[in-house]
Amino acid sequence: MLAELFGEEDRARDMATRLAELARKSRESASAERKSLLAFLRGPMERHFVFEETRIFPALDEHGLGPEVQVAIKQHDALRQLAEKLDSAMPEDDVAQLIFEVARLMLHHTNFEGDYIYPELTHEDWRRLMKETVVSEGKATP
């Protein structure tokens, strides 16, 4: 799951960069990405958020990073709320602007975690998380 976690971070960053640029250039093209963005937010990104919230963030809390964890959780919640707004947007709503907002927050969030929060975990912390992930995935497999 940890390898997937970082892969999803990279995918989110790449997608956000592409969508932000697309929203600046063509509202129609950005709006055409609505369904694929929602599928990404509700699939891979939601799994990513849940994994962080249940596995990574408790370890960060142990390192005294509670305030930073709360910022990341607020960003997760904001992205979930934007996904809801995007899903319920009406034809007269500015879908391209919503997509731009999602992209901007995804970029900010992935940079916040990748550049500031994740480096606070030691090599040993990551090893422990990997072991726990393997054990928990082994229990979940029939």
For each predicted feature, which ranges?
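Small-residue-biased structural context
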Residues: 1-142
